[in-house]
UniProtKB/Swiss-Prot annotation:
NCBIfam families: araaP (TIGR00837), PRK09664.1 (NF007235). This is Low affinity tryptophan permease. One of its GO terms (molecular function) is aromatic amino acid transmembrane transporter activity. It is a multi-pass membrane protein. Keywords: Amino-acid transport, Cell inner membrane, Cell membrane, Membrane, Transmembrane, Transmembrane helix, Transport, Tryptophan catabolism. Involved in tryptophan transport across the cytoplasmic membrane. Plays a role in transporting tryptophan which is to be used catabolically. Belongs to the amino acid/polyamine transporter 2 family. Mtr/TnaB/TyrP permease subfamily. The gene is tnaB. It comes from Escherichia coli O157:H7. InterPro entries: Amino_acid_transport_2, Trp/try_permease_CS, Trp_tyr_transpt. One of its GO terms (cellular component) is plasma membrane. The chain crosses the membrane at residues 12-32, 34-54, 87-107, 128-148, 154-174, 192-212, 230-250, 287-307, 327-347, 349-369, 388-408. Residues 33, 108-127, 175-191, 251-286, 348, 409-415 are periplasmic. It is found in: Cell inner membrane.
Amino acid sequence: MTDQAEKKHSAFWGVMVIAGTVIGGGMFALPVDLAGAWFFWGAFILIIAWFSMLHSGLLLLEANLNYPVGSSFNTITKDLIGNTWNIISGITVAFVLYILTYAYISANGAIISETISMNLGYHANPRIVGICTAIFVASVLWISSLAASRITSLFLGLKIISFVIVFGSFFFLVDYSILRDATSSTAGTSYFPYIFMALPVCLASFGFHGNIPSLIICYGKRKDKLIKSVVFGSLLALVIYLFWLYCTMGNIPRESFKAIISSGGNVDSLVKSFLGTKQHGIIEFCLLVFSNLAVASSFFGVTLGLFDYLADLFKIDNSHGGRFKTVLLTFLPPALLYLIFPNGFIYGIGGAGLCATIWAVIIPAVLAIKARKKFPNQMFTVWGGNLIPAIVILFGITVILCWFGNVFNVLPKFG
C-alpha cells in the first residue's frame, strides 16, 4: 500500500470497525450476566475489563508494527515466541474466529427470519436465511476488505441511531429505586461476589483483537490512526455498554432477571421484558432494527479478521482469485457446521470464551515483552513499561479461573 493510499483513509473508519465488531449481539448478554452484580458493581467490572482489553489490544499492535504490513498472529507468534506457542495461538485464534463466525451465521438466520415473520407474516426458513446472509458477507469480502469496513461503519451508524431512539426514551424513564435495587426482596445483600461469574462475558464484550492486522492493512504503519482506532473504538463501546446497563437495570427490576435467566437468557426474553414495561410501536420496530444490525455488524467484523488471518496463514495473495480462495476457507467450515447444528449462537459464544482469554489477553502481553527485547528501537511502545503486560496477564489468569469456577459451579450464580 502506498503512502497516498494510507493517508486517504480517515481514522473514523478504524474506530467504526473496532466499535462495530465489539458492539454486537453479545451485548444483550451483559445485563443478564451482570444481574447478580447489578448496576454499580457491574459498571465497575466492565470498566476493568475495558481497560485490560484495550491495553492487550495496544500490546498486540505494538508487536505487530515491527513486521511487514499484512502480517498476522501466525507470523508474529512464530517469530517472537516459537513454533509451540505459534501452534497454540493458531489453534485458539482459528477456533475463536471460526466459532464466532458460525455463531453469527446462526444468530443472523434466527433474527432475520423472526423479523420477517413479525412484519410480513411469512415464515422464512432460518437455515436458508443464515446461508444467504453468509453468501452476502462473503461476496463483500471478496470485493475488498475496505468495502466490508465501510458496510460495518454504515451498520454501526444505523445501529447507534436505532439504539438512541429506543433507549433515549427509556433513559428518561429510569426508576432510581430499581437502579439501586431498593425495592427488591434481596435489597441490601452483597453484590460483589457476582462480579466474578460475569468476568468472562465482560472480556468477550471487548473482543476486537482479530481486526488489528486488518487495520494495519488499511492504514499501513500510521500509528496515530491505528492507536486512535483502537482507543476510541473500544471507548465508544464502553460508553454504549454503560448506557445500555443504565437503561436496562433502571427499567427492569433485578428480580425480573431471574425469569429471563431461567428462560435461557436469550435476546428475545430481554426484549420482551423491555417491551412489557413501556411498549410502543416505534420502540418495538427500533428494537428489531437494533438487534438485527447489532449481529450484522459483528458478523462483518469477525469475518474480516478471520479472512485476513487465513490469508496470512496460508500465504494467499490479494488477487481476485486469491481472495476467492480465502473466502471459501473463511465461510465453508462454519456454514457447513451451521447446516448441521443451526441453533448454536449461545453455545458458540460461550465456547469461544476460554480460547479468547489465551490469544486476546495473555499472548499479546507476551508478544509485546518479547518484541521489546528483539526490537529495542521499535516505532511504538505502550506506556507503563512491563507493568501493563503484567496487569493484562493477571487479568487473563483471573478470567480463566472464573471461567472454570463457572463451569464447576464454584462461583455463586444469580437466579
